[in-house]
Amino acid sequence: MAAKDVKFGNDARVKMLKGVNVLADAVKVTLGPKGRNVVLDKAYGAPTITKDGVSVAREIELEDKFENMGAQMVKEVASKANDAAGDGTTTATVLAQAIVNEGLKAVAAGMNPMDLKRGIDKAVVAVVEELKAISKPCETSKEIEQVGTISANSDETVGKLIAQAMEKVGKEGVITVEDGTGLDDALDVVEGMQFDRGYLSPYFINKPEAGTVELENPYIILVDKKISNIREILPVLEAVAKAGKPLLIVAEDIEGEALATLVVNTMRGIVKVAAVKAPGFGDRRKAMLQDIAILTAGTVISEEIGMELEKATLEELGQAKRVVITKDNTTIIDGIGDEAQIKARVAQIRQQIEDSTSDYDKEKLQERVAKLACGVAVIKVGAATEVAMKEKKDRVDDALHATRAAVEEGIVPGGGVALVRAASKVAATLTGDNEEQNVGIKLALRAMEAPLRQIVTNAGEEASVVARNVKDGNGNYGYNAGTEQYGDMLEMGILDPTKVTRSALQFAASIAGLMITTECMITDLPKEEKLDPAAAMGGMGGMGGMI
């Protein structure tokens, strides 16, 4: 086991604080409408330019191991805020730095760290309740646009795109961000249910100019097994041909003779048919087939429940107004499924989302909800260079998470005003069990001014003057650093999602409290490199001296 280096008391805290400040100082320059960029060196390729707090925090690793422990703990604040709300990482870092700095001053002055922590925790609980009280619902498209604009660093085009996307696919819909091909941002909306499986043979294509298969009012057969024998599906093909409608086959796979026969029948015009593989794998495939069945009022033909493909009838087939199949995707538009059954299925999947502990599973379940309920929107980010594209994608991603958070828990005045107002209200009534808890409460409430002060500092103004003016005001009155004007923050469109502000405060206070109560730090001693004796002698010089 490696030898350890141990530091106690003030020595440990001073080192830890230095690491906290290095990381937080790098992150906080990005805060606000006039925040600056940070350039991150990469081992390969061009450097990355970002204004995303968590991206900056993740890059920082310090040489001194004690300082690095402090930096890593603040990095955890940014990561947790990012995981919970997808935004507010810089605010969380600024709050953590302010609480740690104020708290360690009090500890150095002889205060009891545990009582200070209890005071900080009480202040945070009270302020969170106050934030919930001043929060208002985010319902209109205009408010969603404003939240998106602020989170994308005052980029109005991003705010507008997100608002349009939410309008098209609903607040529960899936909105994804992808690289665009041009200089401008674009929004693509996929209506109906789309899954990532394309046609099994290019011979099914009936729109050669677009390279797609389009079926109008088709029957849809859903099969939970491989089809390799054409005799299995022949009765269904004959019934569909008599009905004079096209057929879409969705199966685990269609192989050999069966696929060849389908292609020949399509090319001869005997029956209009297309085949695709079922989406997903294993249990997820079964669930998605059932989703399609409910959407199209069909039945999944599965041997597990004693059904045979040869005996399938038209009543067991689903139907839709239109199906479009490309090389990579299949889209089912306007399935004839019963609205009540679709809603029940959506409710069932939402319950699974609540019960799930895996982020990956939650994401996949959320996609299924969107496909059943509303559709999918894709924001394509345009930029002149790859570096600019990456930076913009980060901002769009932040804005997207912020708007979701705003829809979920509402909005509060932005620009750090909500925390200042909530802290002022709490300061008038909240007291601790002893004097040291009162100090903890006061230092936490004082630290809540830090985001406002940092936004103002980054805008090149005097933080103390602006903070005093804002505190003298009431309600939504605050300072717009973008225009350098005072006024009603909500009317000026400066909004923050309540969830983002709340999460930032809770995670910052939680980890700052742990750091304030730290008394000992332990790390590995650096290993001393032992010199190889032969290397030290410089080798034998090729034994040239022996000749």
UniProtKB/Swiss-Prot annotation:
- Annotated residues that bind ATP are located at 30-33, 51, 87-91, 415, 496
Q: Where in the cell is it found?
A: Cytoplasm
Keywords, comma-separated and alphabetical: ATP-binding, Chaperone, Cytoplasm, Isomerase, Nucleotide-binding
Q: Which residues form a coiled coil?
A: none
What InterPro entries does this protein map onto? Chaperonin_Cpn60_CS, Cpn60/GroEL, Cpn60/GroEL/TCP-1, GroEL-like_apical_dom_sf, GROEL-like_equatorial_sf, TCP-1-like_intermed_sf
CDD domains to which the protein is assigned, alphabetical: GroEL (cd03344)
Per UniProt, subunit arrangement is: Forms a cylinder of 14 subunits composed of two heptameric rings stacked back-to-back. Interacts with the co-chaperonin GroES.
The name this protein carries in UniProt is: Chaperonin GroEL
Q: Which organism is it from?
A: Actinobacillus pleuropneumoniae serotype 5b (strain L20)
